[in-house]
């Protein structure tokens, strides 16, 4: 991570940390860096989610892009993976998404995609950061015909929807409950599943700029669980604010997380001989029960650091086609280059339809170990140094010794927020509470803000 870029772009409280001034500079400097090798006029696609700050930051970002001669295609409200898809298939120079994903409405973020549809690598981000930190802006300032132009491109949304539909099958007879988080999926998920002939019900589809992720979506699936039970739905599908992740709910109203979703899709692909190298890429946060289920099926796993960008890096490097995170980021590289909640939802319903199995039956093949995650608010400059605090390092070592290999502990900084995350897995809820609470108490005493 750099000074400005975290694991998922630049994020902060809108108009306080992520200001219009910074958005303008990101547009100007980011656009310049990403268009250096273009022979024709560069084209950049820009989209946003439904946050009230989105239009403010969009306007500033676009102004910065136009100031270095870039032709900007304004997509409006669109899922993050929609930007990735359109950049790649329409041969644009780059794409930019304005969103803070699952964060609350007061936050926002800006992330860039290269011409290949992948998120920027560290080197490109450092180039942009160097320009941000320069004492003087020495970039060219074209005038008249050298300035960029702005093109409204609402048809991009429908192109993404049609692509999504092309990856699925007819869902006639399937009752699907959708929670679009009052976010970007509001613009597309309903249309996609209607076109696939599903019998749908929808919540979280009334965005007002302030209610994105507020009690709805993949981080708050309780309303969706109730809806599934009340309506007798076959499946519930909860997206986050920018629709790059999915959490599912089975017909009994039980949560099916990213680990179980990856297992279901991975086993389906493996059985068909379509899982590249018979391997799923996952992170250190994946559940031990997921690992055991993969071992039982003879499916290999590759483990990365937390963050979908690291999953994607490993997939690209080694030629894998399925990977993701417990949080619901699932990357299906046969179709798209980034986590895509709606694509994942379509593939999950396809497995149900083709196998004739209920989601609960498919998910029951993974027995999840009790896991507890506690977020502790700390100073941003301390979250990466926590393990250097002797008392914290000592208590973690003590708890790991007590586990004696029957469980695990993971303490790591958030890539996007001023938080230290303490996670443990163990055979019982009582044990996992003990391990996490003991460590968390020491962290709070030593460096916590609350």
From Swiss-Prot:
Q: Name one GO molecular function term.
A: phosphomannomutase activity
Co-factor note (free text): Binds 1 Mg(2+) ion per subunit.
| Phosphoserine modified-residue sites | 101
Residues holding Mg(2+): 101, 240, 242, 244
- Pfam families cross-referenced by the UniProt entry: PGM_PMM_I, PGM_PMM_II, PGM_PMM_III, PGM_PMM_IV
Catalytic activity of the protein: alpha-D-glucosamine 1-phosphate = D-glucosamine 6-phosphate
**Cysteines joined through disulfide linkages:** none
Cross-referenced Gene3D superfamilies: Alpha-D-Glucose-1,6-Bisphosphate, subunit A, domain 3 (3.40.120.10), Alpha-D-phosphohexomutase, C-terminal domain (3.30.310.50)
Query: Which SUPFAM superfamilies does the record associate with it?
Result: Phosphoglucomutase, C-terminal domain, Phosphoglucomutase, first 3 domains
Active site: residue positions: 101
Q: Does the keyword Isomerase apply?
A: yes
Needs which cofactor? Mg(2+)
Q: Which UniProt keywords apply?
A: Isomerase, Magnesium, Metal-binding, Phosphoprotein
- Entry's PROSITE patterns? PGM_PMM
Protein's GO biological process: carbohydrate metabolic process; peptidoglycan biosynthetic process; UDP-N-acetylglucosamine biosynthetic process
Q: Name one GO cellular component term.
A: cytosol
Please outline how this chain is modified post-translation: Activated by phosphorylation.
* EC numbers on record: 5.4.2.10
Per the similarity annotation, which family is this? Belongs to the phosphohexose mutase family.
Query: What's the stated role of this polypeptide?
Result: Catalyzes the conversion of glucosamine-6-phosphate to glucosamine-1-phosphate.
- Recorded protein name is Phosphoglucosamine mutase
Organism lineage string: Bacteria, Bacillati, Bacillota, Bacilli, Lactobacillales
Q: Which gene encodes it?
A: glmM
